[in-house]
């Protein structure tokens, strides 16, 4: 009998600590040792955790102390009961984290002063237990609410309780921004008003009991989506959630014994996405929709199980409802709003419902988010000699810890590394503050500097169950090869609360005797004059010099939650390629990049919830928010794409896709406060289809949509294949007839496939490509501009730029154009990211029997030495991987529009661009040129030769001459051509790069 009682007690304990979608246990049962943190203990503060002593003033003093001394950091709260009687203010970047066998609990005492009456001048008409603010609130000051610049604030592993006599009490006010969250918090509201007012950024594993509302909220700050994973609502008197423009996406929500789950405020809209969730005993409508059939209303449910929910939705304006007769049923899908079944469908307002009756409610999913490993298994990184002082090289200590142990706790500190940290299959790196805890590179760290392929600071295992939590990744400003994290772990892996440092979101770290720099916002404006001009400020010369911040590749996947990747120094914030492993993104903010925020290439089986992009005025005027190539089976939910109020130029599109199928956009929001919202929400480049609505509840890219212009084989007909380019040039073909070209300033390399008749983005490396070519083995050769990395020394000296003797003779060599050099790298077009290799420079003449030499298509020689320099033999050439293709190294490579192939024994044509003529030369076995003769008095940038030896010249239009120089005709093209190449399966199709068109 004693044994049976024990079993019953254990079961009761489990019932008390596990409620459907959430668990109520302490996730930090042991004290995390962190020398940078503060601990709210009787040893440090005059308190008792007995639930009787009022600790309000001591708690506020402790929080303010962390802010004053550290500016960002953690106040650890040990297990116990803490009585408070007034509002506690938590300023930017301060986190309250509980620990102990049981979660600590803060209790608002009965009849606490000020909580009995509605606060008329308060936004939420209430008084709060904990209010997250933008700064420390001094005595007598009005609090400045948390907002768009309130980062890194949090409360975790703490319970809150409102005792009787506080009818206008709300436990939390959380209008904060990135890397701020509430997690593992249960709120016992009782007779109080609500658990939380004004959602922000992200919530995880939260439970609300009682109250008028669990959550009531306005628009998040500053209008971003909000992710809530694993949540429980029970016993609210009015609604589980009351909302207006909240942008909530929710996975694994359980609502029970409530009059309504979602009550949207009158005359407001919302974007609500709900998946894998449960409603039980909802006496009124599950969702109250007040502005039905408005494009701003986007209500989407997937796999929602209901018991005793007779009314799924009520539409107040029309006084209609969606009733369900079944006692227990599954909402397979519910879509309300503006919808398109495919990209060429007519947008229509619809309410689509797919419901099936079921016999019983399924067992609710306990938790959607992977659990951290047991805390007893953690080892502290500091015990391995890591200093975290920002100066000591901690690489060896960190790697030794990884090699010996799986679960590594990383206390706050800035850990300098000089080599890639490589995770084992079960490595889990756990921090608790992504700005206070950073892995950092010094400027020009040798292993990450100069030219080379992408090199990660942190590299996961391939196919492992890795975790990276609560740690910032700082690649510095100038480290050309740097990637923040390369992620190849499996579908069960987990990345959470990771900040890619750089650009916005930086905080001052106090230093003894050093004053914090003052902001520039309130300086008086200067007035420009010819004698004292005022230049626009804010441009950082280091922007866009590194690879991607977060790179998921080689079948990497898993869960990525609460990620902020806004380093303007990176090519883009998030790049996923070559993976079919399931991946889930929960709340990812990607912002402030120069060319591209997000890129997906050859990705399938991913779900993306609450992705938010933002383009800033100085850095992001030309930035493409999302780029997708060759992807399928990808779902976006609550996708927000935003341009800031300071942007003053239009941009083409927000999502640019090529060769994609079954891409679902559920709740799409393309917006800005300015008139320069991106013109098109979604654009299919190959099919020339644009989606004009900026607000959509549902859009499906099927991949079966027809081309808007059919591609025919009619001889002489010009087909536009793609647009939305800037300055397309550098055209080349491989042995199969596929065509490649580049966009120099935007640093993009494109491929046209002759098999699929479609364009794709092949590469967007930080290097600046100008011309492309192929060797005999189909290695893609990329001629690119290379600027020496500032601060990077080799053997104590800066990188040397070779002095080219042919700089004389062209005025282009002035004005800074001799401060860089041209180099060539090769890649395998099937795997460009992993195969980057710099071509060696070897003496001309080293290769006796050249397969082909590659020369500039055009030269600008305005000092009239074109004839001499064209047959001049430079000292060095670049040697391709095949060992027999060369590129003689001329200064003119820095300005040429393409590389033309010179085959020994065949005539070679090139353009004297300044004198506007084509010349003809002979090609020797060693690839050198001789016997220059004038061919035709026409020429500009590119040219091409067909199988019959006819010459095609780009010069405003395309002019055709036979091999004797006789004019045969002209091809009119819709835009000024730059470079030409024959390709296609038969090699008989002329491909043309214009400026913005292909």
Residues of each region from the PLM?
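Long, distal/terminal scaffolding or interaction modules
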Residues: 580, 604-609, 613-619, 623-637, ...
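Active-site-proximal segments of catalytic enzyme domains
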Residues: 561-573, 577, 583
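C-terminal, well-structured subdomains that either form a transmembrane helix-short loop-helix hairpin
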Residues: 409, 576-578, 584-599, 654
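Active-site proximal loops enriched in glycine and acidic residues that flank catalytic Cys/His/Asp
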Residues: 245, 266, 412, 578, ...
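Conserved metal-binding segment of the jelly-roll/cupin
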Residues: 74-81, 85-87, 93-97, 407-420, ...
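Extracellular "leader-to-stem" segments immediately downstream of a signal peptide or signal-anchor
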Residues: 2-76, 84, 89-164, 168-171, ...
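Sequence-structural signature of mature extracellular/luminal beta-sheet repeat domains
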Residues: 707-998
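Ankyrin-repeat and related helical/solenoid repeat scaffolds used for protein-protein interactions
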Residues: 251-253, 264-292, 297-301, 635-638, ...
């Amino acid at each position: 009998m004693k044994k049976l009682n024990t079993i019953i007690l254990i079961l009761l304990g489990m019932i008390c600590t596990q409620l459907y979608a959430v668990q109520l246990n302490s996730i930090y049962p042991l004290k995390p040792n962190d020398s940078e943190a503060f601990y709210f203990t009787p040893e440090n503060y005059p308190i008792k955790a007995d639930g009787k002593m009022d600790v309000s003033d001591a708690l506020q003093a402790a929080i303010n102390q962390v802010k004053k001394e550290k500016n960002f950091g953690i106040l650890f709260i040990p297990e116990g009961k803490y009585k408070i009687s007034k509002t506690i203010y938590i300023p930017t970047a301060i986190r309250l984290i509980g620990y102990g066998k049981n979660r600590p609990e803060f209790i608002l005492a009965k009849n606490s002063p000020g909580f009995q009456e509605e606060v008329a001048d308060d936004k939420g008409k209430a008084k709060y237990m904990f209010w997250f603010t933008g700064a420390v609130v001094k005595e007598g000051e009005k609090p400045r609410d948390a907002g768009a610049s309130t980062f890194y604030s949090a409360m975790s592993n703490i319970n809150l309780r409102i005792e009787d006599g506080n009818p206008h009490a709300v436990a939390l006010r959380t209008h904060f921004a990135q890397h701020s969250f509430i997690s593992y918090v249960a709120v016992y509201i009782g007779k109080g008003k609500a658990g939380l007012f004004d959602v922000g950024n992200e919530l995880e594993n939260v439970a609300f009991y009682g109250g008028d509302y669990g959550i009531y909220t306005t628009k998040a700050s500053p209008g971003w989506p909000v992710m809530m994973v694993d949540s429980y609502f029970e016993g609210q008197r009015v609604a589980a959630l009351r909302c207006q423009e909240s942008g909530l996406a929710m996975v694994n929500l359980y609502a029970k014994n409530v009059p309504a789950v979602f009550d949207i405020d009158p005359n407001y809209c919302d974007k609500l996405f709900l998946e894998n969730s449960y409603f039980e005993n909802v006496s009124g409508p599950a969702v109250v929709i007040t502005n039905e059939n408005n494009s701003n209303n986007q209500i989407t449910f997937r796999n929602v199980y209901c018991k005793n929910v007779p009314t799924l939705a009520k539409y107040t304006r029309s006084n209609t409802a969606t009733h369900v007769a079944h006692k227990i049923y599954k909402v397979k899908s519910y879509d309300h709003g503006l919808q398109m079944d495919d990209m060429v469908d007519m947008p229509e307002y619809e309410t689509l419902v797919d419901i099936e009756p079921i016999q019983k409610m399924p067992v609710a999913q306990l938790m959607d988010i992977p659990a951290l490993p047991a805390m007893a298994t953690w080892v502290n990184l500091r015990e391995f000699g890591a200093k975290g002082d920002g100066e000591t090289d901690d690489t060896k200590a960190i790697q030794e810890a990884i090699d010996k142990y799986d679960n590594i706790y990383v206390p706050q500190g800035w850990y300098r590394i000089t080599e890639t940290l490589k995770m084992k299959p079960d490595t889990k790196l756990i921090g608790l503050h992504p700005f206070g805890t950073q892995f950092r590179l010094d400027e020009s760290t040798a292993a990450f500097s100069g030219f080379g392929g992408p090199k990660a600071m942190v590299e996961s295992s391939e196919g492992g169950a890795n975790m990276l939590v609560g740690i910032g990744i700082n690649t510095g400003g100038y480290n050309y090869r740097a990637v923040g994290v390369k992620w190849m772990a499996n579908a069960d892996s987990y990345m959470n609360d990771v900040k890619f440092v750089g650009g916005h979101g930086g905080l001052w770290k106090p230093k003894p005797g050093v004053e914090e720099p003052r902001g520039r916002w309130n300086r008086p404006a200067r007035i420009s004059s010819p004698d004292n001009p005022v230049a626009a400020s804010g441009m950082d010369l280091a922007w866009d010099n590194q690879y991607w911040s977060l790179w998921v590749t080689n079948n990497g996947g898993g869960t990525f939650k609460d990620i902020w990747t806004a380093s303007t120094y990176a090519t883009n914030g998030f790049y996923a390629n070559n993976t079919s492993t399931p991946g889930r993104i929960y709340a990812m903010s990607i912002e402030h990049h120069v060319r591209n925020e997000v890129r997906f290439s050859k990705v399938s089986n991913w779900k993306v919830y609450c992705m938010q992009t933002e383009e800033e005025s100085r850095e992001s005027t030309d930035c493409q928010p999302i780029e997708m190539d060759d992807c399928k089976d990808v779902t976006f939910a609550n996708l927000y794409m935003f341009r800031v109020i300071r942007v003053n130029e239009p941009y083409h599109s927000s999502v640019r896709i090529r060769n994609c199928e079954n891409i679902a956009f559920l709740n799409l929001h393309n917006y800005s406060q300015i008139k320069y919202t991106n013109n098109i929400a979604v654009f299919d480049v190959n099919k020339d289809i644009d989606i004009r609505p900026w607000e959509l509840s549902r859009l499906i890219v099927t991949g079966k949509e027809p081309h808007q212009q059919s591609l025919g084989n009619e001889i002489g007909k010009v087909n536009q294949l793609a647009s939305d380019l800037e300055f397309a040039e550098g055209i080349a073909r491989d042995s199969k007839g596929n065509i490649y070209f580049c966009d120099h300033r935007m640093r993009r390399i494109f491929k046209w496939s002759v098999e699929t008749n479609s364009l794709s983005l092949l590469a967007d490396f930080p290097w600046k490509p100008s011309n492309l070519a192929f060797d005999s083995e189909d290695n893609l050769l990329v001629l690119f501009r290379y600027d020496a990395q500032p601060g990077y020394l080799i053997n104590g000296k800066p990188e040397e730029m070779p002095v080219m003797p042919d700089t004389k003779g062209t005025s282009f060599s002035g004005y800074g154009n001799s401060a860089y050099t041209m180099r060539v790298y090769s890649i395998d077009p099937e795997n460009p990211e992993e195969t980057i290799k710099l071509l060696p420079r070897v003496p001309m003449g080293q290769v006796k029997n050249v397969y082909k030499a590659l020369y500039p298509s055009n030269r600008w020689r305005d000092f009239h030495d074109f004839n001499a320099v064209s047959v001049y033999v430079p000292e060095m050439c670049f040697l391709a991987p095949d060992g027999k293709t060369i590129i003689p190294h001329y200064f003119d490579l820095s300005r040429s529009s393409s590389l033309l192939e010179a085959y020994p024994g065949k005539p070679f044509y090139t353009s004297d661009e300044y004198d506007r003529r084509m010349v003809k030369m002979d090609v020797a076995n060693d690839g050198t040129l001789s016997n220059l003769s004038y061919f035709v008095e026409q020429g500009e940038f590119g040219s091409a030769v067909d199988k019959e030896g006819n010459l095609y010249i780009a010069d405003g239009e395309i002019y055709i001459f036979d091999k004797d120089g006789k004019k045969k005709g002209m091809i009119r093209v819709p835009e000024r051509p730059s470079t030409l190449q024959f390709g296609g399966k038969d090699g008989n199709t002329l491909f043309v790069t214009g400026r913005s068109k292909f």
